């Protein structure tokens, strides 16, 4: 439904919309604009209850994003996302995925809260500290996450990072790691 993003939709937009849906489902942040063009933030208790209800329904597998946008007169803020990478699970894996990664500038008046299912714990941390924490074994961190974090180390602000990545979106290519046996160990 083109009314969801307020512009001509193309196949590419479906990934941006899916990213916004996942963000809302997994951490409760909804990237959207109000009818007046302002960035959405739940402005009262009633809107907060509506959001919680839709998030619960989304977490139960109901496709409710369009319904939510219509009820609150919202347009998804696809322009606040930048496409960072596209990872494809190696052929040797039984379950394969084709996953696109994005970055976004979170609205200042929305609080991210993990869903307790896909995300069971959350913290704000710099990319450098996330990489170090993973290396030390403080928390699990997988190869795509490590590489995505390495790609954003060195930016001085989220705005700078977002602007840079928006300019480079056409340069994103697919990554499919290759693994092989060497000296009895799987390496890639």
Predicted features and spans:
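Residue-level markers of secondary-structure register and packing in elongated scaffolds
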Residues: 29-32
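Single conserved hydrophobic/aromatic residue that forms the stacking wall/gate
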Residues: 1-6, 10-11
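Short, well-ordered alpha-helical segments
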Residues: 19-20
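Hydrophobic alpha-helical positions that pack around
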Residues: 23
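Nudix hydrolase/Nudix homology domain
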Residues: 8, 41-42, 46-188
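Short glycine/proline-centered loop/turn elements that form peptide/ligand docking sites
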Residues: 35-37
């Amino acid at each position: 439904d083109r009314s969801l993003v307020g512009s001509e939709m193309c196949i590419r937009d479906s990934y941006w919309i899916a990213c916004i849906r996942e963000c809302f489902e997994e951490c409760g942040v909804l990237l959207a604009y109000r009818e007046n063009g302002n960035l959405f933030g739940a402005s009262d208790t009633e809107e907060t209850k509506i959001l919680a209800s839709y998030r619960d329904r989304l977490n139960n597998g109901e496709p409710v994003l369009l319904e939510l946008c219509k009820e609150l007169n919202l347009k998804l803020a696809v322009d606040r996302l930048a496409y960072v990478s596209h990872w494809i699970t190696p052929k040797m894996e039984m379950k394969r995925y084709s996953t696109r990664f994005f970055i976004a500038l979170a609205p200042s008046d929305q609080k991210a809260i993990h869903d307790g299912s896909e995300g069971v714990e959350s913290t704000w941390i710099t990319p450098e500290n996330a990489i170090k924490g993973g290396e030390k074994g403080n928390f699990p961190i997988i190869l795509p996450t490590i590489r995505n974090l390495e790609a954003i180390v060195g930016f001085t602000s989220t705005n700078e990072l977002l602007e840079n990545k928006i300019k480079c979106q056409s340069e994103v290519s697919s990554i499919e790691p290759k693994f092989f046996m060497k000296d009895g160990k799987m390496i890639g």
